[in-house]
Amino acid sequence: MNKLITLILVCCFAFNLYAEQLPAKQFSHPERIRYDQHCFTIEGRDIFILSAAFHYFRVPQELWRDRFRKIKEAGFNTVETYVPWNWHERTMPRNVKDYSQCDFDDLKAWLKMAHEEFGLYTIVRPGPFICAEWAGGGYPRWVAKFCPAKYDTSFWLRSNHPEHMKWTKHWYDAVCPVFAEEQLTRKKSGEKGIIMVQLENEYIYFGMESEKKEEVLRDMAAYCTNNGIEVPLFTCVTPEVRGSKDAVISQLFDMDNQYVWWNIQEAKSRIEDLKRQQPNAPAFVCELQGGWFSTVGGGLSEDSYLDGRHARGMALMAMAGGSTGLNYYMFFGGTNLAGWGARRMTTSYDYGAALKESGGVSEKFAAVKGVGDFVNRFGTQLARSEAIEFTTSDNIKDLTVGVRRTKEGTLFIFIFNKDKKKAFRDNVQFHIKGMPAFNVYCSVEPLDSKVLVLSQANGQCEWYPKEQTLPERPVNMPMPIRIAQAERCDETFQGNWRPLRKGVSLPEIGVNDCRYSMYRSVVKLSKKEVEEYGTLVCEMFTADPLYVQVNGKIAKRASTDELDNTFVIDGLLHEGNNEIVSIYENRGQAHGYRPMEELSGMKSAGLGKKQSAILPIEKWEVKKVENNVKDIKSLLSNNEGWETIMLDQSTIANLATLQIAGLEKPEWPAAWVLQGKEGTAIYRTSIDMTRQMLTEGQTMIEFACVDDAGTLFVNGKEVASHDAWDKPFVANISA
């Protein structure tokens, strides 16, 4: 035991020495707000920040007051929100210096209500990338109009490219003055305000060199300070910030995100890691898992198995590790109204949160309320408590235990029962230096957690959190609805039709985040042209479907792929004027991968020759090869190492959903074979060609999307090559 303690003291000394070597933190108004390695100090008082994520843009303003009231009721002292650029600047400005399209009225009203009416501090996260399962990850769709022809990163957005930074400055110059007016340092003593502003978001998941990320962060910090931001700036899951000695970046601090599901003990170890990596700032969890989002075709968040035990355990284990700031993400999820959710996201953003989408409360709300009660009682003491070493009896293999001690000697013993089925009920003996051994009887249900508070002053001990009773609220059951009559109403296609130039996207004409738009054209054809043309081919800005009507009749899609916007119109055309109407369905803007950078709408369309039905080629074999392909025939004759895959629509859709949800890393046929590394993958398949297919010219093969370079071989002969990112690839294989 003595040897162990000696080792720990040496480690602590080295830990403190490392902290002293880092640049000292500078604060604009340290008497109003500052922080050290332990906690935030606001107006001279150490504070444990317990925050609730609540997005003002996901709930009608008429319901804000109800949600704030319940947040306050649960014991929170802070609320956090993302601030989406595309929500506040929906229409493309004339230039980078034009801020006339920005509207911050709802943000200002939300901040005012939080600060003045409910006495809550606020944390704001303006991105520009926010993720949040939100359209474009917060970027306006019109920003894609300014995408440079060349850039050396996987994405243009989020990068250090001058064009991106120019528009990032535009956004910060617009929104930061709003923050500046509402920050704590501009308020009277005792009033509430913004206490933190985040730069970027989860930068660890963006593929760019650290030096370039640091360049971005330095510029963003300057955009904030130049616009009057005086409260602390922070990042989220950005390793470049932790322990930085850079003059600017060292003045930021990084927070952790914790989505550990039922591995709740990791909440403790992750905080301990954060404190080692960043010894001069408080250990804060920016996103303490409050549930999970739902995707189209998957389960709903409200059916989540992450119950009150999970919400309670996440908080207590983070505290056991030394966290003095927790933000439940989400505490209230809300709704993706009017198509604002990212592609594949459901309208519901309930998130399985403690405060339901409808505003209802449950046992999970009661569990979080118990955490809030505990923080309100002991938060100030916990804020400067220290982890202490201890040993116990050997009967705790299914428990994760942490012990913290205040300067006054009060002990906090945190316990989590990792067993999924069996409750722990037994005496545990604790040995702590300078104290006589003592026994604690622990009764903890499976996957549940508790904290024992032992007061040094009076020798009393008590378990927390206390069980909370939910207030009785009136329940109005919905009245039954019976459909007595239904009528059909055909679209008349009357409206404000506008001329459209080829290659002009919807955002460029002021159409933003609208689910459906209509295109209309009248084409005059001769009798000869009617006999020649039989297809309508539409090129889109992004992978969205069209639905086409020609002369009042629905045109069938040429393939089973609903995103292949080629239509068979043979028999629908006639001599003279032909009316073609297309309904464009906006499936939503992606929120973190390449389509995030694409405009929306139809780019171009044209009539094509008649063609027979498209035959999907779904079954393939694939394998990775070490070197460039030189002898294709010998390579194909080797039947070892090939894996059969399906490139059908349902498989790809399901894999994409898994990838977005982050539930597992799927064996994505095109993207994961090389596992993100340079190399060569070979795909092979067999096609049974009939004489009829050859005579009718059914010899065009189209790949909807090929990334990087590719070469097509048919019967051992090279017939075509491709060298582009994320673009279709069409070749004639008749030769």
Which role does the model predict for each range below?
Residues 64-137, 221-226:
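Aromatic-lined substrate-binding rim segments of carbohydrate-active enzymes
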Residues 165-183, 190-199, 205, 210-224, ...:
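Carbohydrate-binding surfaces of carbohydrate-active enzymes
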Residues 243-297, 314-315, 355:
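Glycoside hydrolase catalytic-domain groove-lining segments
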Residues 103-125, 149-194:
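An active-site-proximal structural segment forming one wall of the substrate-binding cleft
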Residues 55-73, 94-115, 215-216, 530-534, ...:
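Aromatic- and glycine-enriched glycan-recognition loops and surfaces
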Residues 93-102, 116, 127-157, 209-213, ...:
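Aromatic- and acidic-residue-enriched segments that line the glycan-binding/catalytic groove
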Residues 19-78, 118:
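N-terminal carbohydrate-binding accessory modules
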Residues 523-525, 529-552, 580, 642, ...:
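Aromatic-lined ligand-binding clefts that engage carbohydrates, nucleic acids, or primary amines
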